[in-house]
Curated annotation (Swiss-Prot):
<protein>
    <recommendedName>
        <fullName>Protein PsbN</fullName>
    </recommendedName>
</protein>
<keyword id="KW-0934">Plastid</keyword>
<keyword id="KW-1133">Transmembrane helix</keyword>
<dbReference type="Pfam" id="PF02468">
    <property type="entry name" value="PsbN"/>
</dbReference>
<comment type="similarity">
    <text>Belongs to the PsbN family.</text>
</comment>
<keyword id="KW-0472">Membrane</keyword>
<keyword id="KW-0812">Transmembrane</keyword>
<comment type="function">
    <text>May play a role in photosystem I and II biogenesis.</text>
</comment>
<dbReference type="GO" id="GO:0042651">
    <property type="term" value="C:thylakoid membrane"/>
</dbReference>
<feature type="transmembrane region" description="Helical">
    <location>
        <begin position="7"/>
        <end position="29"/>
    </location>
</feature>
<dbReference type="InterPro" id="IPR003398">
    <property type="entry name" value="PSII_PsbN"/>
</dbReference>
<dbReference type="GO" id="GO:0042170">
    <property type="term" value="C:plastid membrane"/>
</dbReference>
Length: 47
């Protein structure tokens, strides 16, 4: 296999892995521990 092909495949795998981990963190089980900073605050724009 050519060096450029190996590097391209490696970078693609890393990018896909990082994207999958980010989606899991945002929407999977770890997301249940996150809090919404806008929840419970009043809207200050109408004052």
């Amino acid at each position: 296999m050519e060096t450029a092909t190996s590097v391209a495949i490696s970078i693609s795998c890393l990018l896909i892995s990082f994207t999958g981990y980010a989606l899991y963190t945002a929407f999977g089980n770890p997301a249940s521990g996150l809090k919404d900073p806008f929840e419970g605050h009043e809207d200050w724009s109408d004052q």
